[in-house]
Amino acid sequence: MQNQKIRIRLKAFDYRLIDQSALEIVDTAKRTGAVVRGPVPLPTRIERFNLLRSPHVNKTSRDQMEIRTHQRLMDIIDPTDKTVDALMKLDLPAGVDVEIKLQ
């Protein structure tokens, strides 16, 4: 797997989970001898919603809610076969979405 790069993108609603998962991935990759760039924090995506409090009248009375999606980006440069196997066996929390691209 010479001259290849693995790009890992993590998404989660809880920043503690995503930081913990990023640390596990970095430790695993470094243990197998790969070079890691990151984790780089990407901008947090904030979705805001307005909901009517009352089902009938009082149009001006509303609740405001938001969902924050935190993102991290990592590059693993010159991964070995051991690196790929270790990353495949890695168990991450359920609230973290992982996207892996080979470049």
UniProtKB/Swiss-Prot annotation:
GO function terms (MF aspect): structural constituent of ribosome; tRNA binding
Superkingdom assignment: Bacteria
Pfam family for this entry, one: Ribosomal_S10
InterPro entries linked: Ribosomal_uS10 (IPR001848), Ribosomal_uS10_CS (IPR018268), Ribosomal_uS10_dom (IPR027486), Ribosomal_uS10_dom_sf (IPR036838)
Sorted UniProt keywords: Ribonucleoprotein, Ribosomal protein
SUPFAM superfamilies cross-referenced by the UniProt entry: Ribosomal protein S10
Gene Ontology CC: ribonucleoprotein complex; ribosome
Example of a GO biological process term: translation
Family indicated by similarity: Belongs to the universal ribosomal protein uS10 family.
NCBIfam families the record matches: PRK00596.1, rpsJ_bact
Quaternary structure note: Part of the 30S ribosomal subunit.
Function summary: Involved in the binding of tRNA to the ribosomes.
Designated name of the protein: Small ribosomal subunit protein uS10
Native source organism of the sequence: Azoarcus sp. (strain BH72)
